[in-house]
């Protein structure tokens, strides 16, 4: 077989396709296999411009029974699962080839060697480079996502297929494909939060467990190649989780669920570290008669009866016993590892320490015994409601919420000067908000941060201090044992954020806390800002907010660390994470940065250790260089021009949303209501009943609905406002301003993935008087594509050829799923459709199929 990576990819896709065909024949019969082939051929012909084939395809789909439609969608969806698997293997092969080809003179772009060279070229000594890298904290926060709906059973089969492909055993491969095809894809019931916790943390003790030591070793080896000496680095990557602590809008995240999330993560971590210590007991069989041993190692192992004369085995057996009894701490285990490592290096066994102890040390510094400390997130209104009940019961104020905003802040600040609890001893809270808030704080063991969504004023955060005091976590003048993080989401809140932070840092309670914590963490939301103001304004507002918030921190002498609430779609801040970091404002990147890792993106980034290493490598490359200091400021005239265009962009976006009939069109044209009714996620889709305003919808379903119909509106609509600027100026900004270039390239991805021809099929579901909205969207799409290609002086995906090829090859196979989905929606919305369980199942499968085909859902 040819060693050309693309030839190997094509061969694997062809093989998996043939095996799927065999499974379809075996389990569904020749007649159904012929239907699949007929639909595939018609879809390809339609894609090539054959109108008759398109009409024939529509007629064929209309004539299918619900069972046939479901089976057809399942066949194409399984095809995409297999193609996605082959593409992941292709990425692994390409990564390995590029890594093998790199030299000191020609390092791989965005790699560890390129980073080491860049650090030296910027004048850093090895000691300075080592200190800089050891200061960095890249915090990746795992969140649940409604479109990561694959059952764990499917994930098991896909991972087994990876192994069968590696082994090259065609018979086992065929058997596994048959098992995959015969497995039910759709959940019978809506996933519980416990399901999401188990699924969301899956990659931490598996592929990331393998990847983290390789990241640390890769950085050390790169610095050794460039500087001539190997440094000692800890893991710059850490992990957090929201799954089981994110209470914002999710009534199913109870204090009991929060307690379960902590227990589950800690138990998973404990099992993995026990296995690692067991390996060390087995491997480090050094005899005391042959190797000098430090006193600390000898004494720690004296209580172990086995392994006489083998002090390192006894030492690690003692550590194993302490961890088994839950008497160990992360810090204690790290100190014990370092002691053993020193002992080995002192007698010339540095290689043994490097091979056997360093990987465990990297894992301990990355995961700790908590695996991923849990964040709590709650909406500010709920926290104030809880605080109001506490103040009423404690006799402080009968109606806190009726007070003016400044008076609420003053009252809380005064109250927090004392340590007294307000709830009478033994009395349970009456109100649900207070019961849940206090219950969550009590259940919260391994503390990440407490994120306050929809932060508007300082008292939104001070409410957390009051509640924490009630459960013994706050004492006046001292910092809380966790960060309290304001989350600014809407356009208005992003613009007010610098003023809110300034007032927080003037507040004695919060200032003492921030100084004790060594800085302030601020979260900025990419989803709601886009939903509120449109793509261009949201991106600019986020950029300007980071600049202004950083300046506020500088004025007070405290660093501001940003937590970027990015999604996977362009509309929600998606795209290559490394490039996104490179495009952040100068001076906004400190020694710590946090990013959300959405459930939907986890398989794409972490399904294989090699992919995980490369993803982390690219992020660390850009983060380490950005954290060195300010980059080049954009020119004032560029800022002025973009601000002007962004205002016009928002005007156009909001005019569309506010036009009479738009949300009636949206509900008819997209499967938004069905997404809310089907068992996709634990969190409700709607903030309020029917959609009459954009505020009635959560951001993820808004984006997901537009993705399903292949419009991807939130990722580009309104961008044509840039046409009001001179083309030469736009080209100059694109070449010279990384943020602007990143923004346009993200929009180009969404525009390229959109397909207005497929979207037009959904007009069958829309009443005639509302169909003009589609024509407007199609015209705006064409106009925006033309504008960006003029700015780039090249096709939309001129610098993303792999993605361009992927879209071109996938579209003919996604199209049939969309065509079937239109017919299923028509039937589902007809009288009696919602009672048809087979129809519900088929419709859900079509939503999953489009998500699998596009490799992005919202």
Curated annotation (Swiss-Prot):
MF term (GO), any: phosphoenolpyruvate carboxylase activity
- Fetch the InterPro entries from UniProt: PEP_COase (IPR021135), PEP_COase_bac/pln-type (IPR022805), PEP_COase_Lys_AS (IPR018129), PEPCASE_His_AS (IPR033129), Pyrv/PenolPyrv_kinase-like_dom (IPR015813)
Provide the catalytic activity annotation: oxaloacetate + phosphate = phosphoenolpyruvate + hydrogencarbonate
List GO terms (cellular component aspect): cytosol
Q: Which Pfam families match?
A: PEPcase
Its GO biological process terms?
carbon fixation; oxaloacetate metabolic process; tricarboxylic acid cycle
Q: Which PROSITE patterns does its entry note? A: PEPCASE_1, PEPCASE_2
The UniProt record lists the keyword Cytoplasm: no
Q: Which residues form a coiled coil?
A: none
Catalytic residues as annotated in Swiss-Prot or TrEMBL: 145, 531
The EC number on file is 4.1.1.31
**Which top-rank group of organisms is this from?**
Bacteria
Q: Determine if Transport is one of this entry's keywords.
A: no
Cofactor dependence: Mg(2+)
Which of UniProt's keywords are assigned here?
Carbon dioxide fixation, Lyase, Magnesium
Q: What class of enzyme is it?
A: lyase
Q: What is the annotated role of this protein in its UniProt record?
A: Forms oxaloacetate, a four-carbon dicarboxylic acid source for the tricarboxylic acid cycle.
Q: Give the record's family classification.
A: Belongs to the PEPCase type 1 family.
Q: What is this protein called?
A: Phosphoenolpyruvate carboxylase
């Amino acid at each position: 077989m040819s060693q050309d990576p693309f030839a190997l990819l094509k061969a694997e896709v062809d093989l998996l396709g043939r095996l799927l065909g065999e499974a379809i024949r075996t389990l569904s019969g020749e007649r159904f296999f012929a239907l699949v082939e007929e639909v595939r051929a018609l879809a390809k012909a339609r894609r090539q411009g054959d109108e008759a084939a398109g009409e024939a395809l529509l007629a064929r789909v209309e004539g299918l029974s619900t069972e046939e439609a479901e089976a057809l969608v399942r066949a194409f969806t399984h095809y995409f699962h297999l193609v996605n698997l082959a593409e992941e293997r292709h990425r692994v092969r390409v990564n390995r080839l590029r890594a093998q080809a790199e030299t000191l003179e020609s390092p791989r772009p965005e790699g560890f060697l390129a980073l080491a060279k860049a650090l030296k070229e910027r004048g850093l000594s090895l000691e300075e480079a080592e200190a800089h890298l050891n200061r960095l904290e890249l915090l990746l926060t795992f969140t649940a996502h409604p479109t990561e709906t694959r059952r764990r059973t499917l994930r098991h089969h896909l991972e087994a297929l990876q192994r069968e492909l590696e082994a090259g055993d065609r018979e086992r491969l065929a058997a596994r494909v048959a098992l995959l095809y015969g497995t039910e894809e759709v959940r019978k019931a809506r996933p519980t939060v416990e399901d999401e916790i188990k699924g969301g943390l899956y990659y931490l003790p598996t592929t990331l467990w393998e990847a983290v030591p390789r990241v640390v070793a890769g950085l050390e080896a790169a610095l050794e190649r460039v500087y001539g000496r190997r440094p000692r680095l800890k893991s710059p990557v850490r992990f957090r989780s929201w799954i089981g602590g994110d209470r914002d809008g999710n009534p199913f995240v109870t204090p009991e669920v929060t307690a379960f999330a902590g227990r589950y993560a800690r138990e998973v971590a404990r099992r993995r570290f026990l296995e690692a210590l067991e390996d060390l007991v087995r491997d480090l069989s050094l005899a005391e008669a042959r190797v000098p041993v430090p006193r600390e190692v000898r004494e720690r192992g004296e209580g172990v009866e086995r392994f006489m004369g083998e002090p390192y085995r006894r030492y690690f057996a003692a550590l194993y016993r302490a961890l088994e009894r839950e008497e160990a701490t992360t810090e204690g285990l790290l100190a014990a590892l370092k002691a053993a490592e020193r002992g080995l290096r002192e007698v010339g066994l540095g290689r043994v320490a490097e091979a056997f102890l360093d990987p465990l040390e990297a894992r301990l510094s990355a995961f700790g015994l908590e695996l991923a400390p849990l964040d709590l997130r709650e909406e500010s209104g709920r926290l104030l409601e809880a605080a109001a009940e506490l103040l009423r019961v404690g006799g402080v104020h009968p109606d806190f919420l009726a007070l003016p905003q400044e008076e609420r802040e003053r009252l809380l600040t005064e109250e927090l000067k004392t340590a007294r609890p307000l709830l009478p001893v033994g009395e349970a809270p009456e109100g649900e908000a207070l019961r849940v808030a206090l219950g969550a704080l009590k259940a919260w063991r391994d503390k990440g941060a407490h994120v306050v969504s929809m932060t508007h004023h300082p008292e939104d955060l001070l409410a957390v201090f009051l509640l924490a005091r009630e459960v013994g976590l706050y004492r006046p003048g001292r910092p809380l044992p966790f960060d309290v993080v304001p989350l600014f989401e809407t356009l208005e809140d992003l613009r007010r954020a610098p003023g809110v932070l300034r007032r927080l840092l003037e507040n004695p309670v919060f200032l003492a806390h921030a100084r004790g914590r060594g800085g302030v963490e601020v979260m900025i939301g990419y989803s709601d800002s886009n939903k509120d103001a449109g793509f261009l304004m949201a991106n600019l507002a986020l950029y300007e907010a980071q600049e202004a918030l950083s300046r506020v921190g500088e004025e007070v002498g405290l660093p501001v660390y940003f937590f970027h609430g990015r999604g996977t779609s362009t509309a929600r801040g998606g795209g290559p994470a490394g490039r996104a970091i490179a495009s952040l404002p100068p001076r906004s990147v400190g020694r710590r940065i946090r990013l959300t890792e959405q459930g939907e993106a986890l398989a794409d980034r972490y399904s294989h250790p090699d992919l995980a290493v490369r993803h982390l490598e690219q992020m660390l490359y850009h983060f380490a260089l950005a954290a060195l200091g300010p980059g080049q400021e954009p020119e004032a005239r560029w800022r002025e021009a973009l601000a002007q265009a962004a205002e016009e962009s928002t005007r156009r976006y909001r005019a569309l949303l506010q036009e009479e009939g738009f949300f009636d069109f949206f509900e008819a044209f997209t499967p938004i209501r069905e997404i809310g009714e089907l068992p996709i996620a634990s969190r409700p889709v709607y903030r309020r009943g029917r959609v009459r305003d954009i505020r009635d919808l959560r951001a993820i379903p808004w984006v997901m609905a537009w993705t399903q119909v292949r419009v991807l509106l939130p990722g580009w609509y309104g961008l044509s406002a840039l046409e009001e600027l001179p083309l030469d100026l736009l080209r100059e900004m694109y070449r010279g301003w990384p943020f602007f270039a990143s923004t346009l390239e993200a929009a180009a991805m969404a525009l390229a993935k959109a397909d207005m021809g497929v979207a037009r099929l959904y007009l069958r579901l829309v009443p005639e008087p509302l169909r003009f909205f589609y024509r407007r969207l199609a015209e705006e799409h064409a106009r925006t594509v033309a504008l960006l290609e003029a700015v780039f002086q090249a096709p939309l995906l001129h610098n993303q050829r792999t993605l361009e090829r992927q879209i071109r090859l996938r579209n003919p196979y996604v199209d049939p799923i969309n065509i079937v989905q239109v017919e299923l929606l028509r039937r589902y919305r007809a009288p009696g459709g919602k009672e048809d369980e087979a129809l519900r199942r088929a419709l859900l499968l079509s939503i999953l199929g489009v998500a699998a085909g596009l490799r992005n859902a919202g």
